[in-house]
């Protein structure tokens, strides 16, 4: 019972980590969209390794799911609904998430600086 309670408590943190990794991957892919190959510093990055491992893990599942649900997607009414939903809610999800992450970071830094003693952080305000 205790193990189940701890795993349920860890679930939101795991979801947050997956969301952050997905956002980082989306931001990196948008930044290097026009370049033929990533720069050398990205090739050596640990984040690039995490991104490639996640892609290895998720790509087959996404492909299998897409193949299994292809019959449903072929229905024109559902396709129209899904396209409208995507256009209304999901098209700009990457930039919105990136903006939210930057605002959250700025807010956290401001709160941290407000708690910092003036002697140490006076020049950073």
Swiss-Prot record:
InterPro entries (alphabetical): APOC4
Q: Which Pfam families match?
A: APOC4
**Gene name linked to the record:** APOC4
PANTHER family hit by this protein: APOLIPOPROTEIN C-IV
Listed name of the protein: Apolipoprotein C-IV
Q: Where in the cell is it found?
A: Secreted
What keywords is this UniProt entry annotated with? Answer: Lipid transport, Secreted, Signal, Transport
Family label: Belongs to the apolipoprotein C4 family.
Q: Which GO terms describe its cellular component?
A: high-density lipoprotein particle; very-low-density lipoprotein particle
Note the SS bond partners.
none
Source species, domain of life:
Eukaryota
Cleavable signal peptide:
1-27
GO BP annotations of the record are: lipid transport; positive regulation of triglyceride storage; triglyceride homeostasis
- Per its database record, what is this protein's job? May participate in lipoprotein metabolism.
